[in-house]
Regions:
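Metal-dependent nuclease catalytic cores that hydrolyze phosphodiester bonds in DNA/RNA
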Residues: 1-139
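Cys/His-rich finger/ribbon microdomains and the adjacent scaffold used
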Residues: 2, 20-21, 25, 206-317, ...
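Accessory interdomain/linker segments of ATP-dependent helicases and helicase-like nucleic-acid enzymes
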Residues: 27, 36, 42-88, 553-692
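Conserved RNase H-like, two-metal-ion catalytic cores of nucleic-acid enzymes
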Residues: 110-112, 124-125, 317-418, 436-441
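Conserved DEDDh/DEDDy metal-dependent 3′-5′ exonuclease domain
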Residues: 111, 115-137, 142-224, 376, ...
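Acidic, Mg2+-coordinating catalytic module of metal-dependent nucleases/exonucleases
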Residues: 186, 195-256, 267, 276, ...
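Long, highly charged low-complexity segments
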Residues: 270, 275-364, 600, 613-639
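Short beta-strand-centered aromatic/proline hotspots
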Residues: 693-719
């Protein structure tokens, strides 16, 4: 938003808004009004620092936009004033005054009326709205279709508001918009002759225009009312939406001791607590909660730790950014420390570094796992463990690093059959699965690792065993408890910084700056090595906590791999690939000699042949993840999940003839957003330990959750603001 001199002398300045402002308002009205207060001079602009990851993504977004521009220029040619055809580029306004904006609007409309094939960055200004449309593309019937580029690989509803905004501006200018509007996403699709194109998502303008008009009306009402009174935007004002995640919200979350500070608190739980007149962490810590379910009691326990009123088993004082901090911890009475495997001298501690914004030039496929880092368990006390990095700076190198890593682990398992691979959180497991599917290699090996419990996620142990006084359970928050004075330092301090650093490395390498490239890469390596070391020390600290409480590590049978492949060539280990898949995979090897176009055709065929197997595998991977992670993990964000808070038996067990016994139960809880829960649909019901008779846990040594398929939804409803399901 910005203000222009009033058209009517002596009146207040006119507010001008953009499509981006409507997107902000749709996501967070509080942020919108805070920014409006800054423009009104009611409050200073806060210094939230530079988000290098956001800046990096914005640069890549510009590159994406100009690639699409180049495609249009190649198709239609540059603007030719003599014919009125080609791609017309509207240069940005050199100033933001009313006359200049009106002139740019007139220039854009003139290019459209002249019949330009494409108008790039068409400027619109109607006195209230100002915006620049990425592309307006002429259709055979003379109408213009709105195209917008988004680096995102998936559609966001807010992006459709921008398309509708420019469609509305065309209507106001008397130019017919095509009924189909298009998002050119960052996701790519292979072309039959080789290369790739960006995925285009088409939408119906008449369907989204009413939503845009409603959001615009809300925006104008909100801003008009705010400017009509003298106060700044107030956090928590009734009727004012707030996302809770942006910098403006986070500032107030901390300032007001908001419930969102509680680790693992979600918006639905916060809303339920507000209904109990509980608004702060302190109030939750001190509240009396009659009838509270186990999830709410866990949150209260966490709030007590963060408020300093909960009982603790220890604390650590440390200095960060020149200030002293204290972190406290408590071991839960019912914990998962016994599930930790017995230490083995062959254990390794694993961490990936990946760049989701790296894009392969030939195929357009996003994402590169460029470093597989491992620290081996120290051979003896006082001797540091060996750090082994597996680097990859291309897609082919990524496959080789993946296979080398699998081979390294398999050979190590031959020597140390009781070993485990420790990591923190789900990224490593997810990345290994993704790599096995992408490269059509090592799938059976990765599956076998998962079945045999080789991978040990210490995050699951932490969240089921201890409480800490921090509002996050990231490994970086835990490190003061066990890393002593060896706390993080260096230029690369978190995953976002490592992504930016890797992009800088690529730039230095490609611009012939080998010394700078080597310096950046060394910083990334140090960061990854510290992550691996931190995972090792966390495992040791958890074992110490268990030992202090007389808890021995897991006593289940050692994980002995069945029929380990004797060959180091792990392509032979893909027992779950069919003959056709294996044959096609051979054609895709770098030394196959196939021309690029033929390789592309073989790749498409290979993907089609293995489609159903991959889809089945993805289903079961997701299923066992849910069984392993439980309801405190990502379920509140997952679709097609009903989180049960209460259950009431409506009919006891009964049998109809020879059918299996059944009963009717009413479940009360929350249906996650976007779920397709319908009467007559069949679902899986999952139980937490202790499990019912006949069920075995899906985790290591038979621990974890499990349940049964075949649960039919009979009726859906709502009760006191909560969802109900009769099954």
């Amino acid at each position: 938003v910005f203000f222009l001199e009033p058209e009517v002398p002596g009146s207040s300045p006119d507010l001008v808004y953009s499509a981006s402002d409507l997107v902000v308002a749709a996501s967070c009205e509080y942020q919108l009004l805070r920014k409006l207060d800054e423009k009104l001079g009611r409050s200073p602009k806060p210094d939230f620092g530079v988000d290098e990851m956001l800046e990096h993504a914005a640069k890549l977004g510009d590159v994406h936009e100009h690639r699409v521009l180049a495609e249009f220029v190649e198709e239609f040619g540059p603007w030719d004033p003599a014919t009125g055809r080609g791609v017309y580029d509207v240069a940005p306004a050199d100033s933001m005054d009313r006359a200049t904006l009106a002139a740019k609007h007139a220039e854009s409309i003139e290019a459209l009326r002249a019949g330009a094939d494409v108008v790039f960055q068409a400027a619109f200004f109607d006195g209230q709205f100002h915006g620049r449309s990425d592309f307006l593309v002429r259709q055979p019937d003379g109408s213009y279709a709105v195209f917008d580029t988004k680096l995102a690989r998936h559609i966001k509803v807010t992006a459709l508001l921008q398309l509708a905004a420019y469609g509305d501006q065309l209507l106001k200018a008397g130019i017919t918009p095509d009924p189909s509007v298009t998002l050119v996403l960052g996701a790519t699709v292979p072309l039959p002759g080789g290369g790739f194109d960006y995925l285009r998502s088409h939408h119906n303008l008449p369907d989204i225009l009413p939503v845009f008009l409603e959001r615009r009306e809300r925006f104008l009402t909100l801003t008009s009312a705010h400017m009509g009174q003298p106060n700044t935007a107030q956090w928590g004002s009734p009727g004012l939406t707030a996302c809770g995640r942006c910098d403006y919200c986070q500032e107030m979350v901390k300032a007001t001791d908001d419930l969102l500070l509680v680790a693992r608190m979600n918006s639905a739980q916060r809303k339920a607590l507000h209904e109990r007149k509980i608004f702060t962490v302190k109030e939750l810590a001190e509240a009396h909660l009659p009838g509270a379910n186990s999830a709410l009691l866990r949150l209260q326990d966490q709030a007590r730790m963060q408020s300093g009123v909960g009982a603790s088993d220890g604390e650590v004082r440390y200095v960060k950014d020149g200030e002293e901090h204290i972190i406290r911890f408590a071991v839960l009475p019912e914990n998962a420390l016994a599930e930790l495997p017995s230490p083995c001298e062959g254990d390794i501690f694993f961490d990936f570094e990946g760049d989701p914004l790296w894009q392969e030039g030939a195929t357009g496929v996003w994402g590169l796992e460029y470093l597989f880092g491992v620290i081996e368990a120290p051979a003896r006390p006082g001797v540091p463990g060996v750090f082994r990095p597996f680097w990859a700076h291309s897609r082919e190198a990524e496959k080789q690093a993946f296979l080398d890593f699998l081979d390294y682990v398999e050979q190590r398992r031959q020597k140390y059959p009781d070993m485990h691979v420790y990591h923190y959180a789900a990224y490593e497991k997810t990345a290994l699965r993704k790599l096995s599917v992408m490269h059509v290699a090592g799938e059976d090996t990765v599956d076998r690792w998962l079945r045999e419990g080789l991978l040990v996620d210490l995050y699951q142990t932490v969240r089921n065993s201890i409480r800490i006084s921090e509002n996050s359970y990231s490994i970086k928050k835990l490190e003061p408890l066990y890393m002593g004075t060896n706390l993080r330092s260096g230029d690369v301090k978190d995953a976002g910084a490592s992504v930016v650093a890797y992009a800088q490395y690529c730039e230095a390498r490609d611009s012939d700056q080998p010394e700078e490239a080597a310096r950046i890469l060394a910083g990334i390596s140090d960061y990854n090595e510290y992550d691996c070391l931190s995972t090792l020390e966390l495992r040791n600290w958890l074992l110490d906590l268990a030992r202090e409480r007389g808890i021995g590590p897991g006593t289940g049978a050692a994980v002995v791999p069945a029929e380990l492949p004797a060959s180091a060539d792990l392509a032979e280990a893909d027992a779950d690939l069919g003959p056709a898949e294996l044959a096609l995979a051979e054609f895709l090897e770098p030394g196959s000699g196939l021309p690029d176009a033929d390789r592309q055709a073989v790749a498409i065929l290979a993907a089609a042949v293995s489609y159903h197997r991959r889809e089945r595998k993805a289903f079961w991977w997701a299923h066992f993840d849910r069984c392993e992670n439980g309801p405190d993990a990502r379920h509140p964000q997952d679709r097609n999940v009903f989180l049960v808070e209460e259950a009431v038996a409506l009919e006891d067990w009964w049998r109809d003839g020879t059918k299996l016994p059944e009963r009717r139960v009413k479940l009360i809880g929350t249906v996650t957003a976007g779920s397709d829960l319908r009467e007559g649909s069949i679902w899986f019901r999952m139980y937490e330990p202790p499990l019912r008779a006949g069920l075995a846990g899906t985790g290591i040594n038979g621990t974890g959750r499990n349940g049964w398929f075949g649960t039919e939804v009979l009726e859906l409803g709502e009760e006191d603001g909560r969802d109900t399901v009769i099954i």
